[in-house]
Amino acid sequence: MPLTSAFRAVDNDPGIIVWRIEKMELALVPVSAHGNFYEGDCYVILSTRRVASLLSQDIHFWIGKDSSQDEQSCAAIYTTQLDDYLGGSPVQHREVQYHESDTFRGYFKQGIIYKQGGVASGMKHVETNTYDVKRLLHVKGKRNIRATEVEMSWDSFNRGDVFLLDLGKVIIQWNGPESNSGERLKAMLLAKDIRDRERGGRAKIGVIEGDKEAASPELMKVLQDTLGRRSIIKPTVPDEIIDQKQKSTIMLYHISDSAGQLAVTEVATRPLVQDLLNHDDCYILDQSGTKIYVWKGKGATKAEKQAAMSKALGFIKMKSYPSSTNVETVNDGAESAMFKQLFQKWSVKDQTMGLGKTFSIGKIAKVFQDKFDVTLLHTKPEVAAQERMVDDGNGKVEVWRIENLELVPVEYQWYGFFYGGDCYLVLYTYEVNGKPHHILYIWQGRHASQDELAASAYQAVEVDRQFDGAAVQVRVRMGTEPRHFMAIFKGKLVIFEGGTSRKGNAEPDPPVRLFQIHGNDKSNTKAVEVPAFASSLNSNDVFLLRTQAEHYLWYGKGSSGDERAMAKELASLLCDGSENTVAEGQEPAEFWDLLGGKTPYANDKRLQQEILDVQSRLFECSNKTGQFVVTEITDFTQDDLNPTDVMLLDTWDQVFLWIGAEANATEKESALATAQQYLHTHPSGRDPDTPILIIKQGFEPPIFTGWFLAWDPNIWSAGKTYEQLKEELGDAAAIMRITADMKNATLSLNSNDSEPKYYPIAVLLKNQNQELPEDVNPAKKENYLSEQDFVSVFGITRGQFAALPGWKQLQMKKEKGLF
């Protein structure tokens, strides 16, 4: 096939395009067959996404376990050619059967099916409405499932997985006694997907619970008629698990082949910084053998760039890693989110918008906090998410201090004063549409004892119980106060380095105290105590020097008028308005004497705000096996928040733990520890004090929902459980009738009776009270549209429609009058 013809299907529309290698040429795979892969073949997949206004593309070449070396080489060559065709910006991935990346598996929400054979044995990707099928599928996984065609025998079964017996017109799901509810639900959704995409919605599905086979005698008879007499089922086969700690070990290598041989030089290990990458070179980043990245600098030659994948394979061989090791090649300036998150920070020069504005007190770089319209926070949750604000901070506030491991109310006049030797709970209550919502901040001082830290976490759970677990819990380590926390105290937040505010404290105040005052309005201003030395000063901020006799408010030459006004207001709180204002460069000698003498400090010109280029990422977290495992959900939507799971949303400067209503007690209790372990094992060397917010299902604030497109607060009440879906599948008697017909030698599966029956659009637009044909299911009218009419009505193919979430399908059907 000519190259231009092969890539004619490429456009800028979001979605995926799949080609199979057939006789060393690219053949387009129909959308209805996406997610089906023959084990004897190789494939090339192009994924196109829009991130804001930018186009993001990934090219994967997939290697079946029985494919030939020639086919594998051909797929790699086409991947390189497609990359060139698209201007060299896509990220390239090498995928091997059974070892696919989370990104790849995420494209196929209903699962991946491995089919025996390949193009060499005459296997074709068939279109919809084919019933001449007889196979047994072994389904593994809970989040992104994989189904493999296995021998049609009871010997293929085990107690821990789910199996689908697919007989064309009938699909029977057998659930291993030790499989979990998530696996059973995903397998059922796969069975429904096969029914709807491949059988035009006309196959029947039955379910057998492996520990209650006697309750399904008719279905068991079908299984035994097909597979023979039931034998003893094998024990559970444990899944291969890669510990998150293993993923956290990373090494950066410089690679060259100038002497004709692959030369690898170790550059650095965790934590990595972006400046290590030279734009004229190529590098390999080794994630402990679990994944290999190749970074191609802009200045590298075309030959070096094209050889990137072969260099990675040579590196894998040199390291004696498995040949199935996942490989990703990235281009300088077009790096994937997965690659960038392996570095301590990833900045983009000349970028004016971005996420992750994280800075520490004392650094010369400044954050310019833009003012925003608070009325947008609930009408546009994406604004709340970007600003990290649920409202303007005008709700009700209650503050307690941990004292003798118990909660002691803080007097109102001391609200906003926090001491580094203490821990505090701050309960904030606000209303949305007349309904109260709660945020519980757990502020932990840098010098608080371990007992106090533990008590603050325990007491937070107790306070949360008063609201039936509806409060959002936010752990705040001293110095990492979120913007909303500062807004609560209206520009009057003061953080003392040590000491305590409890009564009877015998520790005297230091004779000299220096506070750095940061912020330009009441939503982002705080005073933080810093060491009382001249070296603590910064020309871009305002500082308050306080003694028992004199008070100086020092204006750095880079501070703005708004910053000075807010600092003066806060200083008057600490000094009763008796402070002397001093401009940088006009300090009296006494000022320097109080700071121990004049010494150099950060006085360079104001630096540009640094924009960290990070993307929000969603993970499923688990430590059920004794190993901490996180699985990323790519291109996530609200549908990916499973009520049986604990999910982690990482927005870099905040980490959200979302707890599903049906999550088990152990996972709920260990939620905070899970988030802390995630930060600790993150390969980039993340700040362990990153704020952690614990969110309960049904009580999500806009700072969380804003990270999801088109958040629907009613999605779970409208959603269906595994048992409800099972009830909808119909009775076993219908399956018995079909299987009896299938055994009848006079019945041809390709006869006119088995052909799908279609009706004109006008007929199907009638409601139930009108004259719908008797054989039309009013809840599934779309199944009776011809392929041409289906595209005409919905604007997409039947396969694309089947891949949509259930709520989206229902919405489209209502809009078109087909429900």
Swiss-Prot record:
UniProt-annotated binding residues for a 1,2-diacyl-sn-glycero-3-phospho-(1D-myo-inositol-4,5-bisphosphate): 109-116, 135-143
Sorted alphabetically, which keywords does the UniProt record give? Answer: Actin capping, Actin-binding, Calcium, Cell junction, Cell projection, Cytoplasm, Cytoskeleton, Disease variant, Phosphoprotein, Repeat
Which is a Gene Ontology cellular component entry for this protein? actin filament
Free-text tissue specificity from the UniProt record: Most highly expressed in the small intestine and colonic lining. Weaker expression also detected in the thymus, prostate, testes and uterus. Expressed in podocytes (at protein level).
Supply one GO BP term: regulation of diacylglycerol biosynthetic process
Q: Which residues carry this modification: Phosphotyrosine?
A: Y85, Y758
Segments of this protein annotated with the region Required for interaction with F-actin: 628-819
Keyword Methyltransferase listed? The answer is no
Give the Gene Ontology MF terms in alphabetical order.
actin binding; actin filament binding; Arp2/3 complex binding; phosphatidylinositol-4,5-bisphosphate binding
Cellular localisation = Cytoplasm, Cytoskeleton; Cell projection, Lamellipodium; Cell junction, Focal adhesion; Cell projection, Neuron projection
PROSITE patterns given in the database record: HP
Please name the CDD domains in this protein's record: gelsolin_S1_like (cd11290), gelsolin_S2_like (cd11289), gelsolin_S3_like (cd11292), gelsolin_S4_like (cd11293), gelsolin_S5_like (cd11288), gelsolin_S6_like (cd11291)
Describe the location of the HP domain by residue ranges.
753-819
- Please list where the region (Core) is annotated: 1-731
Question: Where do the Gelsolin-like repeats lie?
Answer: 24-73, 145-185, 262-306, 403-454, 525-565, 628-669
Consequence the record notes for mutating R135Q: In NPHS21; inhibited actin bundling capacity; slightly decreased interaction with PLCE1; disrupted EGF-induced diacylglycerol generation by PLCE1
Where do the segments described as Headpiece lie?
Answer: 731-819
The similarity comment for this entry is: Belongs to the villin/gelsolin family.
Please explain the role this protein plays, according to its UniProt record.
Ca(2+)-regulated actin-binding protein which plays an important role in actin bundling. May have a unique function in the morphogenesis of neuronal cells which form ganglia. Required for SREC1-mediated regulation of neurite-like outgrowth. Plays a role in regenerative sensory axon outgrowth and remodeling processes after peripheral injury in neonates. Involved in the formation of long fine actin-containing filopodia-like structures in fibroblast. Plays a role in ciliogenesis.
Assembly: Associates (via C-terminus) with F-actin. Interacts with SCARF1. Interacts with PLCE1. Interacts with ACTR2 and ACTR3; associates with the ARP2/3 complex.
Kindly identify the disorder that the protein's record connects it with: Nephrotic syndrome 21: A form of nephrotic syndrome, a renal disease clinically characterized by severe proteinuria, resulting in complications such as hypoalbuminemia, hyperlipidemia and edema. Kidney biopsies show non-specific histologic changes such as focal segmental glomerulosclerosis and diffuse mesangial proliferation. Some affected individuals have an inherited steroid-resistant form that progresses to end-stage renal failure. NPHS21 is an autosomal recessive, rapidly progressive, steroid-resistant form characterized by onset of kidney dysfunction in the first year of life.
Protein name, per record:
Advillin
